[in-house]
């Protein structure tokens, strides 16, 4: 049995792509998108028609902003025709520090999905794990709008999300590894930071164990992988969202995949609670240079790709 099929025995496998044609062969349960993945997809000839249709359908309703939302919904609906579960659709990263605007955008996206006949239970609204984003999620969850908290790099972000009642978090693995490699430079020891010792893997394991120890219902979905080794090291996580390239590698690789994370192991661990009110959140995040820098960088990158997509829409709209 290949590694992908073995992984599915322990973990819900999610496709991390906007390229819905590509995901079919891996039969994922759910799918995740973000501005960068949508931008990448719409530049392919086979998806140009979706973009042009969104311009025709939405431009007269509210210009470029309306078309941007329409593109997200169009991709989401196509994806939901393939996966049996949920799709994650991301709120504009430029709203990451505005609770009210994030809530309004999320409500609007859900309305658009419901107009297309998609039940809100099949949609996760992706929101950056800033303090303001977490407060937005708290409001939305009470309204039955389920949230996927993204750009999450630290335990305090994860705890704040769980205490807010978020449906799901997406702790990043690869971007954490990237930061530590860059900091170490020529002194980086790849062997010492592989497998279970990978700093990104350690971060997700710490979050998973904390959640299971203290009985939080928020789902843990590891994200942002650089290798199949990172994925295999997190077998047993509630979900893992994986790019098509790495899904392909897992599907082609024979070899044993063992459960690495489990509720029993987590509950047996000696784990202390940490505070995650606003002062504690801001202080602990500030003290974590990696999390602070990667959160800020991630917001900038997603915002930049949203702007590129807007320009593409404006060109088509004429």
Curated annotation (Swiss-Prot):
Protein keywords: Cytoplasm, Pentose shunt, Schiff base, Transferase
Gene3D superfamilies recorded: Aldolase class I
Gene Ontology MF term list: transaldolase activity
Any one GO biological process: carbohydrate metabolic process
Pathway: Carbohydrate degradation; pentose phosphate pathway; D-glyceraldehyde 3-phosphate and beta-D-fructose 6-phosphate from D-ribose 5-phosphate and D-xylulose 5-phosphate (non-oxidative stage): step 2/3
Record localization: Cytoplasm
Catalytic activity: D-sedoheptulose 7-phosphate + D-glyceraldehyde 3-phosphate = D-erythrose 4-phosphate + beta-D-fructose 6-phosphate
Catalytic machinery residues: 126
Cellular component terms (Gene Ontology): cytoplasm
InterPro entries: Aldolase_TIM, TAL/FSA, Transaldolase_1, Transaldolase_AS
PANTHER family linked to this entry: TRANSALDOLASE
Family classification: Belongs to the transaldolase family. Type 1 subfamily.
Function according to Swiss-Prot or TrEMBL: Transaldolase is important for the balance of metabolites in the pentose-phosphate pathway.
Protein name per UniProt: Transaldolase
Species of origin: Cupriavidus pinatubonensis (strain JMP 134 / LMG 1197)
Gene that this sequence comes from: tal
């Amino acid at each position: 049995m290949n590694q992908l099929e073995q992984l599915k025995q322990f973990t819900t496998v999610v496709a991390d792509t906007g390229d819905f044609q590509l995901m079919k062969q891996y039969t994922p349960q759910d799918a995740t998108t973000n501005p960068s993945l949508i931008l990448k997809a719409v530049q392919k000839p086979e998806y140009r028609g979706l973009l042009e249709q969104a311009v025709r359908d939405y431009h007269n309703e509210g210009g470029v902003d309306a078309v941007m939302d329409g593109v997200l919904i169009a991709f989401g609906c196509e994806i939901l025709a393939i996966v049996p579960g949920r799709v994650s659709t991301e709120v504009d990263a430029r709203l990451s520090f505005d609770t009210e605007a994030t809530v309004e955008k999320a409500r609007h996206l859900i309305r658009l999905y419901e107009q297309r006949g998609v039940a809100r239970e099949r949609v996760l609204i992706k929101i950056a794990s800033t303090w303001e984003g977490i407060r937005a999620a708290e409001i939305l969850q009470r309204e039955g709008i389920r949230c996927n908290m993204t750009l999450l790099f630290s335990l305090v972000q994860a705890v704040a999300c769980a205490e807010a009642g978020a449906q799901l978090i997406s702790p990043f693995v690869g971007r954490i590894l990237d930061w530590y490699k860059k900091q170490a430079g020529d002194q980086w020891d790849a062997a010492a930071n592989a497998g279970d010792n990978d700093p990104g893997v350690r971060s997700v394991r710490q979050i998973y164990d904390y959640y299971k120890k203290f009985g939080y219902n928020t789902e843990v979905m590891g994200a942002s992988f650089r290798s199949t080794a990172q994925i295999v090291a997190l077998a047993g996580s509630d979900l893992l969202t994986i790019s098509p390239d790495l899904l392909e590698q897992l599907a082609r690789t024979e070899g044993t995949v063992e459960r690495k994370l489990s509720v029993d192991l987590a509950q047996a661990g000696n784990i202390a609670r940490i505070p995650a009110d606003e002062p504690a959140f801001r202080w602990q995040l500030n003290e974590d240079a990696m999390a602070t820098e990667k959160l800020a960088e991630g917001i900038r990158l997603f915002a930049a790709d949203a702007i590129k997509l807007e320009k593409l829409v404006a060109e088509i709209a004429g």
